[in-house]
Amino acid sequence: MREETPEQPAPLRSGYTTGSCATATSLAAARLLLGGTTSDAVRIVLPKGQQVPMRLEFCRAWENGAEAGTLKDAGDDPDVTHGALVFARVRLSAAPGVRFHAGPGVGTVTRPGLTLAVGEPAINPVPRQMMERHLTQLAAEHGYTGGFEVTIGIEGGEALALKTMNPRLGILGGLSILGTSGIVRPFSCSAYIASIHQGIDVARANGVRHIAACTGNASEDAMRRRYALPEIALIEMGDFAGAVLKHLRKAPVEKLSLCGGFGKISKLAGGHLDLHSRHSSIDLPQLAGWAAALGASAALQQSMRAANTSQQALAQAHAEGVALGDAVCAHALRFARSIVPAEVRLEVFAIDRQGNLVGQAGEERS
């Protein structure tokens, strides 16, 4: 989960994806094999046509091939791979075409549901296309009619992967080589949202009919206590409730349980799909209004409006016997229902900071 960062006066700096790093290093290694030339940088073309220089840490002969490496620069994005060494080892082969292999620190797909087949190295389609295009052009320039065996690795990738969703997605042994544009946009969250979609797709492909989308570890633990769900049924949505709800339009499941902290669920109840404090805030007067509909006294409503936090407002309501937690979950369920297909049964749970259940609503109680 990403932490809120202070505002910065200067524009945030973009970086490059692991797919761009893999393209640059595989091109540099292949160029050394075919032309005998090396340098401390290589220029690649991104999917939208931009030409960018990529600095190399090394480019040298390796066994019966060549290898090159670059340090992943994610710009100002808090990417887990920022600063990691991405490297490519390339061998020439008699058969034409480009064949990809997972090196140290790059994972292998072990579950269906992803865009890659089981057993394939976790090198996504666009990075594969980028490497194929650059290597094919290089081969044509040198009159080379053979093929390439390309192994991509990330130094320390196996340990870094444990900080990502890869193990839950069934990508084992390391990280994925990612990217659709070749560029990392700071705080775009596109990779995180893509992993949410992948998590749902993998769950469906493996026969899971009930998923639980949770805002964090405490809410995941609450769902584990309530249901005997397999690990792949637990979707870490963080603040991106909209990523879950909208994806279910085209990839529905039988049942969705939404679980989060009371404050996050309050935002969802208020009609927000991005629950991060940068994009949505808790509406204390709205909470007081919902309490009023449940019979809250004028004094309680006033104290709730003046509360410091949603948790304080909740405690005030519960102290007077007003079931605010359940009401907030009911409002959140109605909003989620307006997005999710009717075939998906919904339920919503809210927890406090200790992970205790403070509210729930559902179309099916269990």
From Swiss-Prot:
It catalyses: Co-precorrin-5B + S-adenosyl-L-methionine = Co-precorrin-6A + S-adenosyl-L-homocysteine. Keywords: Cobalamin biosynthesis, Methyltransferase, S-adenosyl-L-methionine, Transferase. SUPFAM superfamilies: CbiD-like (SSF111342). Transmembrane segments: none annotated. GO terms for molecular function: cobalt-precorrin-5B C1-methyltransferase activity. Pathway: Cofactor biosynthesis; adenosylcobalamin biosynthesis; cob(II)yrinate a,c-diamide from sirohydrochlorin (anaerobic route): step 6/10. Its EC number is 2.1.1.195. Belongs to the CbiD family. This is Cobalt-precorrin-5B C(1)-methyltransferase. It comes from Pseudomonas paraeruginosa (strain DSM 24068 / PA7) (Pseudomonas aeruginosa (strain PA7)). The gene is cbiD.
